[in-house]
Amino acid sequence: MNLTALKNMPVSELITLGEKMGLENLARMRKQDIIFAILKQHAKSGEDIFGDGVLEILQDGFGFLRSADSSYLAGPDDIYVSPSQIRRFNLRTGDTIAGKIRPPKEGERYFALLKVNEVNYDKPENARSKILFENLTPLHANSRLRMERGNGSTEDLTARVLDLASPIGRGQRGLIVAPPKAGKTILLQNIAQSIAYNHPDCVLMVLLIDERPEEVTEMQRLVKGEVVASTFDEPASRHVQVAEMVIEKAKRLVEHKKDVIILLDSITRLARAYNTVVPASGKVLTGGVDANALHRPKRFFGAARNVEEGGSLTIIATALVDTGSKMDEVIYEEFKGTGNMELPLSRKIAEKRVFPAIDYNRSGTRKEELLTLPDELQKMWILRKIIHPMSEIDAMEFLLNKLAMTKTNDEFFDMMKRS
């Protein structure tokens, strides 16, 4: 029996399965407790149980395998990993581990890991020779992540505008600057769907911090990738723990030469959470931001890089502006120059209900010549010269009208050449 398979089952099916095994009063229990009871009952028959999860090492030296389904929240179905196993396989927080597990003995509360079968979807022996993330060489993004799907749909227009305004590469550190109600969540959903469609080889993770629960459900249903969330009714310490787990998992995968993409909504709320959690230093900046609070969210955002040894970590984060909060302005100013791609959204365009509400003239990517072919780059620059004199609303309407006449950006450039 596999623990992960049980976690993916709906509660109604779990209750039916438990009742077949002779368990009672399951309807009043939480999902994690039902799984725990089923596995315990299954283990009595002497059959093997397998489980997996993402390792979180605690201060005492031992660790637990947390589940992505519960957004890495501690629960009764977590798997205990002993300090000797952590030392033997040189494990670190964020490692994805799969293996054989055993039920808790007398006086124990958790399942325990017996045998490690896989570390980060690879053989355990291979994990020992990897280079630490901190020792990898960062480079400019030089491999393009195309957003355009080429199906001519209205959703694809957003992706095509993105490709023209600010191309995204593997290892990009991008900032979407968004006022309220400018369509940032829909934009992130579009990016996620484009990545899943065009780049299935990439590991996609969507991290939602301080979001509404219904938006989390919507994202989980729309996105083919891992959606990890901490909703606004959770404490700040929980936001921080979730973010740390996601970034550590991403770093471990990059060490195994994987291309990882994190879409974060939003870095402002994450910085606010760190501001609440960090011990007071006594130095307070404008807006009530502690002087030490922004170091850790900067380390999170700064982890995005293209790696010379293979693999990359891309982070596209949203930053909130015009919220009326001085703290949000300070946080945005701190992150302003750190990214190598910026995509400002405009409230004026959104108020006219023109979507995507991208401010074309202000958006752009550093070193875009590494991501685009010289011929395409030339055409993009000509397009910028045409659009530059227009107001932000006219520019977006003009671009969307012209793009709607064609199915792909190549066709659009051909049409532009002819006219």
UniProtKB/Swiss-Prot annotation:
The keyword Transcription applies. The record marks K326 as: RNA-binding 2. GO terms for biological process: DNA-templated transcription termination. CDD domains: Rho_CSD, rho_factor_C. Residues 48-123 form the Rho RNA-BD domain. SUPFAM superfamilies: Nucleic acid-binding proteins, P-loop containing nucleoside triphosphate hydrolases, Rho N-terminal domain-like. The keyword Membrane does not apply. PROSITE patterns: RHO_RNA_BD. Its EC number is 3.6.4.-. GO terms for molecular function: ATP binding; ATP hydrolysis activity; ATP-dependent activity, acting on RNA; helicase activity; RNA binding. ATP binds at G169, R170, G171, Q172, R173, G174, K181, A182, G183, K184, T185, I186, R212. Keywords: ATP-binding, Helicase, Hydrolase, Nucleotide-binding, RNA-binding, Transcription, Transcription regulation, Transcription termination. Disulfide bonds: none annotated. Residues 284-288 are annotated as: RNA-binding 2. It holds the Pfam family ATP-synt_ab. Belongs to the Rho family. Homohexamer. The homohexamer assembles into an open ring structure. Facilitates transcription termination by a mechanism that involves Rho binding to the nascent RNA, activation of Rho's RNA-dependent ATPase activity, and release of the mRNA from the DNA template. This is Transcription termination factor Rho. It comes from Buchnera aphidicola subsp. Acyrthosiphon pisum (strain APS) (Acyrthosiphon pisum symbiotic bacterium).
